[in-house]
């Protein structure tokens, strides 16, 4: 993996994604080379046990939203937005919960990396996001400062918004009741 580095004043940053499927090691070593200089960094890693979740939705919904065609269309449709590496930083401070009705992690319905089983079909997959449970009339807020790079409909995720926060960091908001922003 070759990360993209972003200069911000006298600092240089790179976001390095680490998949939940990577084999566990107590550390990951990075070798960074720039203009003839080599630096080695070691990142300590904490082992995580991902929980399992049985998800009860109908076969009709699964065939409409979770079939191979919908998944492939989502991946293909979103690829250009996630490939873009905005060189400007739009974020600062800490991430916020995406709704004022969310007060703590008890509002998380499904966490990142959870082993999910669709009980109607037995299909298993890893969950690639974080699902928050909010009321249908609750406003959804951007978790970080940024610019909207996609606002529209996707078969798998319904009404969807993608926000670019800069430096390759993006958030995706899916299954929305309505959209009141534009690109």
Summary of predicted features, one role per range:
Residues 31-33, 133, 164:
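A generic structural motif
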Residues 1-49:
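Cationic-aromatic interfacial patches
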Residues 37-39, 138, 167-170:
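Short acidic/polar mixed-charge low-complexity motifs
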Residues 43-157:
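Surface-exposed, glycine-biased beta-strand/turn segments
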Residues 142-180:
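Zn2+-dependent peptidoglycan hydrolase active-site motif and core
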Residues 13-15, 129-133, 162:
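Short aromatic/hydrophobic contact patches that present stacked aromatics
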Residues 2-3, 30, 130, 138, ...:
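Residue-level detector of beta-strand structural context in well-folded domains
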């Amino acid at each position: 993996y070759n990360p993209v580095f972003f200069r911000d004043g006298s600092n240089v940053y790179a976001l390095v994604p680490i998949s939940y499927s990577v084999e566990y090691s107590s550390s990951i070593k990075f070798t960074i080379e720039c203009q003839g200089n080599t630096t080695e960094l070691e990142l300590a890693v904490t082992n995580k046990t991902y929980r399992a979740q049985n998800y009860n939705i109908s076969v009709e919904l699964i065939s409409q939203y979770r079939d191979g065609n919908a998944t492939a269309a989502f991946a293909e449709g979103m690829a250009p937005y996630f490939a873009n590496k905005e060189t400007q930083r739009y974020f600062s401070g800490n991430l916020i919960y995406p709704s004022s009705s969310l007060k703590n992690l008890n509002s998380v319905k499904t966490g990142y990396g959870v082993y999910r089983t669709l009980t109607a079909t037995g299909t298993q997959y890893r969950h690639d996001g974080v699902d928050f449970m909010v009321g249908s009339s609750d406003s959804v807020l951007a978790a970080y400062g940024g610019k909207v790079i996609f606002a529209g409909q996707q078969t798998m995720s319904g009404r969807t918004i993608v926000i670019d926060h800069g430096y390759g960091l993006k958030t995706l908001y899916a299954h929305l009741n309505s959209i009141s922003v534009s690109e």
